[in-house]
């Protein structure tokens, strides 16, 4: 029995040993942090129901780890940042202020756990892991190291740090509210679902910068960015907006996060060699500090810098000794504010309050350049390589001991400067945003909540992060300035403005940030306001606004000619073509002038075209008018002579009626040339051709009547036979038929397709030639074709009858008249076709006058000569001639011919 009990006891012990061994084995394989992170900061979580985490760049960098050490090491930090220290103190001050209020979280108090991010991604990620796990936990339990509920994070003090932290915290949907991270990628809710911020995105800042560039007329701007998310995405957005505005980025370089002489010199070279005099700097003050030293080292002073909100008010850059190089900097900053009670809270800091507060000790040592007694806290340490890249710069601890009696009132540093509380104000608003979200969550009424089908509520401290995010997305509250803080769907500040700041040097030799304008934004509406009376300091030799262009703006009269393979701001100025103008400077294309206008000599303005037509007032027109009137007077003079001597044998032998018709037609043709002179109009275009055609028709028809009479007379003299009588009525009938036929064709011409006036702008671009469009070419050719046919018949009949008796030379006169007529109009054709404008009209008038003068001279001047100067030859015996040589026995006088013809029924009558 005893042995049995012993066996059972041994078995139980074996079982217990196996179970405990298995448990120990399980614990050994549990996931845990491999080592503790070297983090510094502040914590106050005891006796508080909620804790807000904070990440602030209290230091500006980490100390490089010795590459010989193989084991992973959490690096130390260096480069105390007074600005980041003030932001951290502002968070603590705000939490204490909220805890004292009764209208926000009345039944709860807030604690905090704040870590120093050292402005380094690795430290931001270390801190994020600790926020989720604590340094001793095996897995995330959403409690900090004090055990209180972690609600949200304020931070992380830089875009790249916020991106890194949010990629970890976003996995658990932990709310993160940024106070200075403006990188546009953080607006992407797919990548960063739980990130919010109380400042606008860089999309708006880039929009503001481009508007500023456009306002000052700059088109060629350089860009330099930090080699991080803030710089890369900022410049990317800036370039896109510059391209949309048809502006150009001359160069784009980066400032290395870890000093690289090669990369830094590349950026410096771009600044020195580029023609761009305006440069945008997308970087933080910490990253910019070394670049500033490079600018000073290379003595680059003639540049205008456009600053972003990350460094525009930074005391690290805005030092009086930097003003010759960066004076006149212009840029954007979020609105500044006055925070009640903050200044007193900032002064309430002293190492004696907590001997273990290493950050306060380092602050004191750095501020007063002394060493705190019995402290091993280093300060003023800089392990970065200098600009030569060949040596380290290390500042040892001061031999002077701190007494503790030093007065903060004697300091002039960023920490105590409360005149430019811009990002500091945003730290306060970030804390309040979380507090208001928690307050809304705590006020949920059971059965009226937003969660689940039962409208459940979430409760403190058991809520989940995603439940708090529901309220954070809907956040809307009034700040301490009584201004609304509203976030949009991307978690960015929806409404607000940027101040436009300009760096001046005040009377005390310090840099002052002068507000010269503002950029208002409300949803998608933007407005840049810079009053004309704003006092802007420009760091140029002339103290005037600088120009920044690749190619100077093309003057009026030229257009931009894009250079192949170069930005659109680099171009050649090409003169506008004839007929095109550019009235403004910098036009891309020349504008065509209107139909009635033409470009001036400078191609800068459209001027009315010169109007050309054969005017009465010009020399050529006046000469032709004189010739026309003179010709008409000569014809009238001949008519007077004929009327006075109408009973003389010579006039009677020339058929007086037909002669008068010829004289009248010559007056018509000569005076019709006046219709070709002067500014054409529709009625004159129709009248000129019709009048000319009818005049020539009457003239040639009358001549044709005469030539037929001569032809019959010649046939009688040759054949000695009696022909059919040519009674005078038949000659008149020939004239009537020809004229009536011509009138019919002209009427059809005017009705169907009449000539019209039109403005010819094709022959000479600089002129508008007023001329007549002759309408139907077929009708016009038909009309004048009939005249040519009549002239040809006249010539043929008179040519046959040219051998009538010598003293009777009517046939010869008509023959010569027709020859002159043909010569003139045959010569007219090539001359007319080879001339343009008013000279073409002058050629036509000359042909009309020449042919009219030719007919007048050949038909009437010889007879007038006899009538007026040789009256003795104006007798029946003299006027009658001899029969041609083929039959000299036949004498043909006017009397004998008349007697002979009148004595028979078949005869040819030469006269009545």
UniProtKB/Swiss-Prot annotation:
Signal sequence, start to end: 1-21
UniProt GO MF annotations: G protein-coupled olfactory receptor activity
Additional remarks: The variant protein sequence is capable of binding the sex pheromone, 2-octanamine (2-1, methyl heptyl) via aa 11-17.
Glycan-linked positions: 24, 38, 299, 386
A biological process term (GO) from this entry: neuron differentiation
Tissue occurrence: Expressed at the sensory surface of the vomeronasal organ.
Transmembrane segments: 624-644, 658-678, 692-712, 733-753, 779-799, 813-833, 841-861
Family statement: Belongs to the G-protein coupled receptor 3 family.
Function noted in UniProt: Putative pheromone receptor.
Domain of life (superkingdom): Eukaryota
Source organism (scientific name): Mus musculus (Mouse)
Protein's name in the database: Vomeronasal type-2 receptor 1
Extracellular side: 22-623, 679-691, 754-778, 834-840
Compartments, as annotated in UniProt: Cell membrane
Membrane topology reported for the UniProt record: Multi-pass membrane protein
């Amino acid at each position: 029995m005893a042995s049995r009990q012993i066996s059972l006891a041994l078995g139980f012990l074996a079982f217990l040993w196996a179970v405990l061994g298995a448990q120990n084995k399980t614990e050994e394989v549990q996931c845990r942090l491999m080592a503790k992170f070297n983090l510094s900061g502040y914590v106050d979580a005891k006796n508080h129901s909620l804790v807000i985490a904070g990440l602030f760049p209290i230091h500006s960098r980490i100390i490089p780890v010795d590459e010989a050490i193989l084991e992973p090491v959490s690096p130390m930090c260096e480069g105390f940042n007074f600005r980041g220290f003030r932001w951290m103190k502002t968070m603590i001050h705000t939490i204490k202020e909220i805890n004292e209020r009764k209208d926000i979280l009345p039944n709860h108090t807030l604690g905090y756990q704040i870590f120093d991010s050292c402005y380094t991604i690795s430290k931001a990620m270390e801190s994020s892991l600790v926020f989720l796990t604590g340094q001793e936990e095996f897995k995330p339990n959403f409690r900090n190291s004090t055990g209180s509920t972690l609600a949200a994070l304020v931070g992380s003090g830089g875009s790249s740090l916020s991106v890194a932290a949010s990629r970890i915290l976003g996995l658990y949907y932990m709310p993160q509210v940024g106070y200075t991270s403006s990188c546009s990628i953080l607006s992407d809710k797919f990548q960063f679902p739980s990130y919010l911020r109380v400042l606008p995105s860089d999309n708006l800042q880039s929009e503001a910068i481009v508007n500023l560039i456009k306002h000052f007329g700059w088109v060629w701007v350089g860009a330099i960015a930090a080699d991080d998310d803030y710089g890369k995405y900022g410049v990317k957005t800036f370039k896109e907006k510059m391209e949309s505005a048809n502006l150009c980025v001359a160069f784009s370089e980066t400032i290395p996060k870890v000093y690289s002489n090669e990369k830094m010199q590349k950026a410096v070279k771009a600044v020195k060699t580029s023609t761009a005099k305006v440069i945008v700097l997308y970087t933080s003050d910490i990253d910019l500090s070394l670049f500033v030293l490079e600018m000073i080292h290379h003595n680059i002073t003639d540049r205008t810098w456009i600053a972003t909100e990350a460094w525009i008010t930074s005391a690290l850059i805005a030092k009086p000794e930097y003003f010759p190089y960066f004076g006149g900097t212009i840029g954007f900053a979020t609105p500044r504010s006055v925070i009640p009670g903050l200044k007193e809270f900032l002064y309430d800091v002293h190492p004696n309050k907590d001997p273990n507060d290493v950050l306060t000790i380092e602050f004191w040592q750095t501020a007063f350049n002394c060493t705190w007694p019995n402290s091993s806290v280093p300060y003023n340490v800089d392990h970065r390589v200098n600009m030569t890249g060949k040596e380290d710069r290390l500042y040892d601890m001061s031999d002077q001991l701190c007494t503790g009696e030093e007065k903060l009132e004697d300091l002039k540093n960023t920490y105590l400067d409360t005149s430019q509380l811009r990002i500091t104000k945003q730290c306060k608003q970030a804390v309040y945003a979380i507090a208001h979200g928690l307050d809304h969550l705590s006020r949920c009424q059971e059965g009226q909540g937003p969660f689940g089908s039962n409208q459940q509520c979430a409760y403190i401290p058991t809520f989940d992060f995603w439940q708090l995010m529901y309220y954070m997305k809907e956040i809307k509250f009034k700040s301490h300035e009584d201004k609304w803080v509203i976030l949009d769907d991307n978690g960015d500040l929806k409404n607000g403005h940027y101040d436009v700041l300009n760096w001046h040097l005040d009377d005390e030799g310090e840099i002052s940030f002068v507000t010269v304008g503002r950029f208002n934004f409300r949803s998608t509406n933007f407005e840049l306001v810079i009053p004309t009376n704003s006092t802007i300091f420009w760091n140029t030799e002339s103290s005037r606004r600088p120009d920044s262009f690749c190619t100077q703006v093309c003057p009026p009269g030229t257009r931009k000619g894009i250079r192949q393979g170069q930005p659109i701001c680099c171009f050649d100025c090409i003169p506008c073509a004839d007929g095109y103008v550019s009235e403004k400077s910098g036009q891309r294309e020349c504008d065509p002038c209107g139909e009635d206008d033409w470009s001036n000599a400078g191609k800068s303005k459209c001027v009315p075209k010169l109007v050309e037509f054969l005017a009465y007032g010009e020399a050529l027109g006046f000469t032709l008018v004189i010739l026309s009137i003179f010709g008409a007077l000569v014809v009238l003079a001949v008519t007077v002579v004929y009327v006075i001597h109408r009973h003389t044998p010579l006039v009677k032998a020339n058929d007086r009626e037909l002669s008068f018709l010829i004289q009248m037609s010559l007056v018509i043709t000569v005076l019709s040339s006046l219709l070709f002179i002067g500014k054409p109009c529709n009625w004159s275009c129709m009248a000129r051709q019709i009048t000319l055609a009818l005049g020539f028709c009457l003239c040639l028809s009358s001549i044709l009547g005469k030539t037929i009479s001569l032809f019959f007379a010649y046939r009688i003299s040759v054949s000695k036979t009696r022909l059919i009588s040519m009674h005078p009525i038949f000659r008149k009938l020939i004239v009537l038929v020809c004229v009536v036929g011509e009138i019919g064709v002209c009427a059809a011409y005017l009705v169907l397709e009449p000539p019209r006036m039109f403005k010819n702008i094709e022959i000479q671009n600089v002129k508008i030639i007023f001329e007549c469009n002759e309408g139907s070419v077929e009708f016009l050719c038909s009309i004048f074709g009939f005249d040519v046919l009549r002239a040809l018949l006249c010539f043929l009949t008179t040519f046959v009858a040219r051998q009538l008796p010598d003293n009777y030379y009517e046939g010869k006169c008509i023959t010569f008249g027709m020859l002159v007529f043909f010569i003139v109009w045959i010569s007219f054709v090539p001359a007319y076709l080879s001339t343009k404008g008013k000279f073409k009209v002058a050629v036509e008038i000359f042909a009309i006058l020449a042919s009219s003068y030719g007919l007048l001279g050949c038909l009437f001047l010889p007879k007038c000569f006899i009538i007026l100067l040789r009256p003795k030859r104006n007798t029946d015996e003299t006027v009658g001639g001899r029969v041609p040589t083929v039959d000299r026995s036949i004498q043909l006088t006017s009397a004998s011919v008349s007697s002979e013809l009148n004595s028979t029924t078949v005869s040819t009558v030469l006269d009545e």
